Each structure stands twice: as structure tokens, then as C-alpha cells.
């Protein structure tokens, strides 16, 4: 299923939960909406590239598996 940007934004806000939810939402939105690289996101959020990839993959799984 394809989502509009506004629908996807709302789904991310509603479905990405947890201890670091705000950070994870920001990372997922920057990656999906702005196309920011994993490397740049890692620098921006002071995380490893692997951590950023895991956040994005898990977030995409939550959003797109429904």
C-alpha cells in the first residue's frame, strides 16, 4: 500500500513508540522524507551507522507491515 506523505507522517507519530520514540521518529522521517544518508543521520544523532540502520529498518517494518 502507498501512503501520502501526510498519512505516513501520522502513522510514524502514532506507531513508533518506546523509550527513544521521539528520536526514532525524527530519524525515520529524515530518512524517508528527506533522503538523508545513514552516515549523515549517524553524525546528526551521535549514533553509529548500524544503530541508525536498525532504527530505520525496525520503523519501516512497523509502518509497512500493517
Segments (PLM) and residue ranges:
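Short alpha-helical "recognition helix" segments of helix-turn-helix
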Residues: 40-45
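Short, Lys/Arg-enriched N-terminal segment that forms or immediately precedes the first helix
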Residues: 3-17
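C-terminal flanking helix
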Residues: 60-66
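Short helix-coil-helix linker/hinge
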Residues: 17-24
Amino acid at each position: 500500500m502507498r501512503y501520502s506523505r501526510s498519512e505516513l507522517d501520522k502513522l510514524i507519530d502514532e506507531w513508533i513508540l518506546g523509550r527513544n520514540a521521539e528520536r526514532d521518529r525524527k530519524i525515520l522521517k529524515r530518512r524517508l522524507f528527506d533522503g538523508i544518508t545513514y552516515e549523515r543521520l549517524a553524525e546528526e544523532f551521535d549514533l553509529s551507522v548500524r544503530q541508525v540502520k536498525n532504527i530505520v529498518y525496525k520503523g519501516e517494518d512497523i509502518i509497512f507491515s500493517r
